[in-house]
Every structure is written in structure tokens, then in C-alpha cells.
Swiss-Prot record:
Gene designation: atpG
Record-given protein name: ATP synthase gamma chain
Family annotation (InterPro entries): ATP_synth_F1_ATPase_gsu, ATP_synth_F1_gsu, ATP_synth_F1_gsu_CS
Superkingdom in the source lineage: Bacteria
UniProt record, GO biological process: proton motive force-driven plasma membrane ATP synthesis
Known function: Produces ATP from ADP in the presence of a proton gradient across the membrane. The gamma chain is believed to be important in regulating ATPase activity and the flow of protons through the CF(0) complex.
Cell location: Cell inner membrane
Organism: Flavobacterium psychrophilum (strain ATCC 49511 / DSM 21280 / CIP 103535 / JIP02/86)
Disulfide bonds: none
TM segment ranges: none
Oligomeric and partner information: F-type ATPases have 2 components, CF(1) - the catalytic core - and CF(0) - the membrane proton channel. CF(1) has five subunits: alpha(3), beta(3), gamma(1), delta(1), epsilon(1). CF(0) has three main subunits: a, b and c.
Keyword field: ATP synthesis, Cell inner membrane, Cell membrane, CF(1), Hydrogen ion transport, Ion transport, Membrane, Transport
Protein family according to the UniProt entry: Belongs to the ATPase gamma chain family.
Length: 286
């Protein structure tokens, strides 16, 4: 059994760790609220934009999307991996990294590059895959305009023929305890299918519907990427809050066990001292 000093040191160490994890949990909870409000606020806009694009595209020829919908033989693939800049968030980053590697295996025999958004994904994936860029600084100022610049970079690479397919992998936010890894095709735009009835109202379009669609598609792509990053940002704080909550509970349990061990050891030491005193007294009498 460890001596009393060692046990006291361990209790102090665990208590300090517990204070840190508890503080991190509270910070993540506050950040989660803001991130959750942001993703909730933008979803109606994203859904309405998609609905409008669906209604317009359903009444046009299949090639109305121009370069954005052009299907090419898949030889070069770019996978956008959205992770976080910090750790201590459970399997949040690991799940995305695992899915990126699965996609690389799926496209075996083809050129597969990674476009990292987040330091954690970049640090791991750059060891085994070709990472062409890392835009982790976007989290320092997470605005639509900053994300739009990244979306434009990706779009330019596709239109220029550098890649035949671009996919985005991220954690979709459900709630604080649940994040679901999503793989979405970014470009080319997948054929638009909807079970909803197409609005066929008598509208006058200015300019033409074709021009409106070609204007909406870039906006839709920027919104899609912004939504993915916002989802990931909220998921990160939810995952970290959950992880720190579990860590705090585990630290509390370990501290209580150490206190029990300490009390038992202290009681045993006192008992031994009493026995030694009694034994010494008996020896003097004898």
C-alpha cells in the first residue's frame, strides 16, 4: 500500500485535474449555446435557398447548371476534412479522420488529396495522405465572408479541372451528446431530386431563369460549406462539454476512492503505532 504522502499527492493532483475539467465543461457549455444559436438561425435560409434552386432547376434543361453540374470521369478527388484546432473533445476529430481515410480507400487507384479545415485533421492526415492546404485560421473569425472565400477556392479548383469531384466531411450537430459524421458531395452538383411538388406559379424572371440558377449555385455552395463548418463548430463544443463532464465525473470518483484509501492507510498507521506503544509498555512491565 502506498504511503500517506504519496496518496495525499495523488488526491491533490486529481483534485486539480477535476477543477480544470469542470472549468472547461462550463466554458464549452457557454460556447455551445452561441454556436447552437448560430446554426439554428442559418438553417431556414439554407433550406429556403435549396428549395428555390430545386424549383428553378426542375423546369430547366439538365445542363443549365453549367460547369457546376458537369459530370467528368473521376480521376482526381479532393476531400475537405473539417475538424477542430483543439483536442479534448472525445472522438470528434477521430471520427472525421477515419471517414476521410475510408474515402481515400474507396477511391483507391485515383489521385486523392485532402483540403484540411482544422489543425487536428491536418496534423494526422498529413502523415499518410496528401494535404494540399490547411485553412484552420477560419475558426479565429468564423464569418460567412471568410468561409465564402474558401468555398470560392474549392469551386475554382473544380471549374479549372484540377479535380473531378470534391467532397466535404464534417460532424453534423444534433445535440450536445450526439454528432453524426456526414459526407456530402460538394461538386459537381448532384442531380436535384425532391419529393416535394415543384412550384409552377406564373413568375416573370429578370434576368432569365438560367442566369438566376447560375447566380444561385455559387451562393448555395458557399452556404453549404458555411453550414458544414458551423455544424462542426457546434458539434466540437458539444463533444468537448460531454467529454469534460465525463472526465470530471471520473476524477470525482477517483478522488473519493483515494480518500477512502488514505483514511484506511491512516487508520492502519495509527493502529500500528498504538500496538507498538502497548507492546513497549508490556515489555517494560516484564
Amino acid at each position: 500500500m502506498a504511503n500517506l504522502k504519496e496518496i495525499r499527492n495523488r488526491i491533490t493532483s486529481v483534485s486539480s485535474t477535476m477543477q480544470i475539467t469542470s472549468a472547461m465543461k462550463m466554458v464549452s457549455a457557454a460556447k455551445l449555446k452561441k454556436a447552437q444559436d448560430a446554426i439554428t438561425a442559418m438553417r431556414p435560409y439554407a433550406e429556403k435557398l435549396t428549395e428555390l434552386l430545386q424549383n428553378l432547376s426542375a423546369t430547366l434543361d439538365g445542363d443549365a447548371g453549367g460547369e457546376f453540374t458537369k459530370q467528368r470521369e473521376i480521376k482526381k478527388v479532393l476531400v475537405v476534412a473539417i475538424t477542430s484546432n483543439r483536442g479534448l473533445c472525445g472522438a470528434f476529430n477521430t471520427n472525421v479522420i477515419k471517414e476521410v481515410k475510408n474515402r481515400a480507400d474507396f477511391y483507391a487507384g485515383k489521385q486523392v488529396d485532402v483540403f484540411a479545415i482544422g489543425k487536428k485533421g491536418n496534423d494526422v492526415l498529413s502523415k499518410t495522405l496528401s494535404v494540399i492546404d490547411n485553412q484552420s485560421s477560419v475558426f479565429d473569425a468564423l464569418t460567412f465572408d471568410n468561409v465564402a472565400k474558401i468555398a470560392q477556392m474549392l469551386t475554382d479548383k473544380f471549374v479549372a479541372g484540377e479535380y473531378d469531384r470534391i467532397e466535404v466531411i464534417y460532424n453534423q450537430f444534433k445535440n450536445a451528446a450526439t454528432q453524426i459524421v456526414q459526407t456530402e458531395q460538394f461538386l459537381p452538383l448532384a442531380p436535384i431530386k425532391s419529393d416535394l411538388p415543384v412550384s409552377t406559379g406564373d413568375y416573370i424572371f429578370e434576368p432569365s431563369k438560367e442566369e438566376i440558377v447560375l447566380t444561385l449555385i455559387p451562393k448555395s455552395l458557399k452556404t453549404q460549406l458555411y453550414k458544414g463548418i458551423r455544424d462542426s463548430f457546434a458539434s466540437e463544443h458539444g463533444a468537448r462539454m460531454t467529454a469534460m463532464h465525463k472526465a470530471t465525473d471520473n476524477a470525482t470518483e477517483l478522488r473519493d476512492q483515494l480518500k477512502l484509501t488514505y483514511n484506511k492507510a491512516r487508520q492502519a498507521a495509527i493502529t500500528n503505532e498504538i500496538l507498538e506503544i502497548v507492546g513497549g509498555a508490556e515489555a517494560l512491565k516484564g
